[in-house]
Structures are given as structure tokens and as C-alpha cells.
Amino acid sequence: MEKKRYNVLFIQVDQWGEKFLNFTGNDKIMTPTINQLARDGVTYSNCYSTCPVCIPARRSLMTGLFPKAHGDRVYSDRMKMPSVTTLAEAFHQAGYHTMAVGKLHVYPQRNRIGFQDVILQEEGRYEFGGPDDYQIWLGENGYIGQEFLHGMGNNTYYTRTWPLGENAHPTTWATGQMVKQIKRRDPEKPAFFYLSYTFPHPPLVPLSEYWNMYSDQDIQEPEYGDWEDESFIFKELMEAARYYSHKEMIRAKKAYYAQCTHIDHQIRLVIGALKEEGILDDTILVFTSDHGEMLFDHGMVGKRTFYENSAHIPLIFSGKPIVDIRGKIDDRIACLEDIMPTLLDLCNIQVPDTVEGRSLFEKERRDFLYGEISEGYRATRMIRMENYKLIYYPYGNKIQIFDILQDKNELHDLSDKDEFKNVKEEMLIRL
């Protein structure tokens, strides 16, 4: 008897850390749709980006390879994908109709990496071979050259509300395009839908409707630990955030939350399209991010660090096909590289031999996870074990250890504490 081939809706967001979701304990942010996905599926509460930088993280996701194997731990925007079977190719070879909407962040920009249909939206990066499909749509609908009319940058934390029509907002546009893809799928084949939003990554330009949800609300102050000193590496990591006033920091956090809530509401529309088409009950839903966002905690912004805000990401598998594990929270150490083999296992597709990640439905758990970012004076390495995390900066030989179980916000560095000497030695061996 032929095994069931489920449809997949894979929702990828950009720069959305595990900390910024309501169901993980953040009562200041509204994410009702994602909360429901978590209730209806399994959540991996210790999932990490092994290289929390846009391109390397997405290469790991799409190949199941760790950065050392796929070749990028920096941000190599002219590096081609490795010659291995990608996640999309594996589904295509198994007879799926593979469709992508949004950000792929590959080179060359129009490389389909195994998707049969691609509607591209790449944050206005013309240097990679634009225009993309979103920019073409803007030109055809009276918005030519207005993508950045708001004046906010892709890596800055000033904010203003979206100045164009709601239908032209990148989040709303991507949702509409995915709904169209769902309706035009091949009805004779199972479908792999990949929806890759470019937000909440800056620019911070929420729709007024969502900005107004947070503008008058109290919100968390930036958090600082007992370890931010005058070390060279900390000065480097904190450089980008030091130009913002306290008022600008709070506004940035509210705008970021607004962009998250906008995405959450749009996801509901995509799920609604699956239901209208009569395929929701046969569809596995996946939600994750490439990496997180420091958002002024520890005096930092962006990613490229192994602190929880940046490296700890959400991962949910949901939907009726996995109803047997509904509401489960799995605390094993997981990573982006595990998503490909897990999804292929769920859909009864053979996992390529090249994949280094492991299926999260196996009983065996890894003892530790290794992560690496960058080279030169900003090089950073990480070891994550059951309770503890070690962060190592080779330049300056700086070591930090955090008890993630007791100190999730990493306020207390334990690396110089005598009672953690054995923990430190064990983790350094792993490094």
C-alpha cells in the first residue's frame, strides 16, 4: 500500500526570534495564529540557527548541511548553492508541485533551487539581478520606484508607518501571491508551498493599523547583563545600537512587534485558503525563522551573535496529519539543518545521503550543538548542551557560559565561577 504524501505549507519568517512570540511567554506581543499552530502541533523549544546570518542560515535550511559543509559562515552573497539535493528538489523528485513565494536569498537571484514556480521578493536588492516580481508588480500598479519611499533602511532601526496602500506592503503582497499559488496548484499532485516573508526584518515600516495596536502600550525595556564590559568584541557587537536614543529603541521594538502581528494575521488568510480548497486536513504546517533579532538587549541589534535573541528560533510542526502529538513541547536541542530530514520523513520521502541534520521524530537526541559565525576579529563559536551554552570569541580568547535553563535572558556569565569549572572544561572539549 502506497504511503500518504501530505501537502506542506512551510512558512519562513526573517529575523524573528523565539523570544518574540506570545505562546513562548511574551505577553506584550499578539500572535494568536501562531499560538494556535503551537496548540495544534509540536513545538521544538530549543531550536537554534547554527549560523544566525541570513544567507548561511537559509543554505542550511535548504540543504540540511551545517555551515562548514555548505561553505558559508559569513554572508557570501555571490556564492552558489552547493551541488546537493535541496529540500525543494527532494519534494519535486518525489512528484510534488513545488511553489515558492517571497525571499530565497540565493545566487544567482533567479536560481529556483528546485522550485517549479517562484514568485520572488528580495528586499530591493538590485545588485543580485533584480528587479524581482514584487518590484515588477509595484511598477505595474502605479508604485514604480516607491518601494523605499518610507526612507527606512534594511538594517536600521528608525521607524515610520507604511506610506503606500495596504496591498503594496510586502507582507500583504506575499500573502496574496501565496493564496493565488494555492488556488492554481496542480490538483493531481501533492503540493509543497514555501512562503518566505521578508519581515519582521527591518525596515521597520508597519501598517498604521498594526502600529496603533502597540503605539500607546507599555513594552519591555532593553535588558542588560552583568558582563557587558569594555572588551573589544563587545564594543564591536554594540556599535550599531549606540546611535539610538531610548525613545527610538522603544519605538523600534513596538514597530517590530507590529510587523510580527501583521504576519501572524496574514498567516491566517493563507491557512484559510487551504481550507477553502479542501486540502487543509491533508497539509503539514511548518513555522520557523532563519535567525532572531537582538532588538537592543545587551546593547545590540540585528543578528550575527549566539545570544538567545539572535540564535534561538521558533520551530513548529502543526496540522491534522500530526494530530497524535498535538500540543507537545519537545525540548531536545534542534537546529535548522534538522527541518529537511524531519519534513521528508513526515511525507514518506527518502532523505538524501548528503543531509547532515537528523529527523526530529527519531528517539535519539544530540548531546550538543556546534555553531559558528564569521571569521577574523568577529569570529564567534558556540556550544549548546542540555542546560548550558558556551560562546567563544577567538579574537581576545573571550569565553562566556550561561545557564539557559535558569537564566534564559543571559544576564549572568558563569565562565569565571569556580562551581562551573567542570562544565566549562567539558564544553571547551566539545568546541
Which ranges hold each PLM region?
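Residues forming the ATP-binding cleft of Hanks-type serine/threonine protein kinase domains
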Residues: 405
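Formylglycine-dependent sulfatase
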Residues: 1-393, 398-399, 408-429
